[in-house]
Amino acid sequence: MDLQYQSGFANHFSTEAVPGALPVGQNSPQAPPYGLYAEQLSGTAFTAPRHENRRSWLYRLRPSAGHGPYAPYVQERLKSGPFGAAVPTPNRLRWDPLEIPEAPLDFVDGLVTLAGNGDVATQAGMAAHLYLANRSMIDRVFQNADGELLIVPQLGALRFVTELGVIDAAPGEVVVIPRGVRFRVELEGPVRGYVCENYGPMFRLPELGPIGSNGLANSRDFLTPVAAFEDVERPTEVIQKFQGGLWTGTWDHSPLDVVAWHGNLAPYKYDLARFNTMGTVSFDHPDPSIFTVLTAPSEIPGTANVDFVIFPPRWMVAEHTFRPPWFHRNVMSEFMGLVTGAYDAKAGGFSPGGASLHNMMSDHGPDVASHKAASEADLSPHKIEATMAFMFESRWVIRPTKYALETSELQADYDACWTGFPKAKLP
C-alpha cells in the first residue's frame, strides 16, 4: 500500500476514506453521513487554553462503546510509575542490546521497561521501554490510557495501523501515538527499538527563542496519516494499559473502523534526517538543549517532564575547542539510546540497540579514549556521519527497574571507561 500523509504539526486536519463521510458545518449532526457514529476523542480537558487544546472528531462504523468488560492481562516485563520495586542508584548504568527471542513475540508482549519516574495516577513522569518483536499483532490492538508513546525504531521497519490511519516507520524515523488511540503493529521481520511513554502533557515543539522562526524540527516535516479503516467482523482482542496494568477484552469486530475524522489530535511520524541541526560556528560546545526535537513540559517553565533530544550527523567546526560533549553533572536525568553508528563521547561499549542511564548529579562525560582523541585532534572542519544517538531527559530521577538491574545485558564494568585519566600538571 502506497501510504499518504498530511503535513504539519498539530494542524487541524480533515480527512475521509469515503467521499462525503465527513459532516459539513458541524461535528455531531442528528444523522451523520452513511449512518456513521460521531465520537470525540479528547487529548486535553475541554477548557484547556485554545493553543494547547487537542481533540479530534471520529466518524466510525460502530460506536466504540459497544464492548464488554476487560479482565487483567499479565505481561511481567512492562512496568509503570511509581517505580518503587528497585532502590534508586546514583551509579552510572549501561546496557548491551537485548537479543530478539526466537519464540513468537509481538509488539505488546515484547515491551520491556528499563527505567522510569513519576506516577501514572498523577499524569506526571515517564518510562523508558525497549521493544523486541518478531511477529505482527494478529487480531489484536493496543491502547494506552496512561500516556502517549514516542516510538524510536532501531532495527527493522514497522507499520502502525491506527484508528486514524496507517503509518510506516523505519530506523531513522520516530512515531508518536497519542494517549488512548488504538493501534496494531505489523512487521515484515524482527524488530527492536525504544519507547518513551510520556505520562505528562503532550509532546510539542520547543520554543526557538533567538534562533528565530525556523530551525530544529520544522512543523511541515511532521506527517499525519489520512483516514483509513477496516470493516472486520471477527473476534479482536483489545489490550488496554490502564493505571500501570494491562487489561484485555474481546470485541466482535475490529475497532479500527474510523471512516473519517477531523481535528488536531492524531498520531504522527517524523524523519530525524529532516532535523535542522544548530551548533557553534566559533568556539565551545553549546548546551545539548539545541538538539531538542520534542518537549513535554512540567509545571516549571523551561524544565521538562521529558525532552526528546537527538545527536544527529553534523559538522564540527569549533576553533580551539574540545568538540565532543563535555564532562557534566546535571540536575536533569538522562536516558540515552543509539539507533545507528557511534556516539562521539564514547569510543566503545555503547552499541546500537543499547542504552545508558546517567541520573541527577551523576558524573558523566567522554571516556578516556574519546577524550584523548578529541584533545589531540586536528581542528579542521569535520563531519560526524552515519550516527543517530538520542536522549530522553527528565526533571525527575529515572529509576531503573528490578529487571534492568539484574539482566545480563547490564555492563558490570561501565565505570571502567572513566579510569586512566592522567592528573593535570600544575606549574
From Swiss-Prot:
Cofactor: Fe cation
Active-site residue list: H285 (proton acceptor)
Catalytically driven reaction(s): homogentisate + O2 = 4-maleylacetoacetate + H(+)
Signal peptide as annotated in the record: none
Any one GO molecular function term: iron ion binding
Any Pfam family the entry gives: HgmA_N
Physiological role: Involved in the catabolism of homogentisate (2,5-dihydroxyphenylacetate or 2,5-OH-PhAc), a central intermediate in the degradation of phenylalanine and tyrosine. Catalyzes the oxidative ring cleavage of the aromatic ring of homogentisate to yield maleylacetoacetate.
PANTHER family in the cross-refs: HOMOGENTISATE 1,2-DIOXYGENASE (PTHR11056:SF0)
Name by which UniProt lists this protein: Homogentisate 1,2-dioxygenase
Organism of provenance: Caulobacter sp. (strain K31)
The organism's taxonomic lineage, starting at the top: Bacteria, Pseudomonadati, Pseudomonadota, Alphaproteobacteria, Caulobacterales
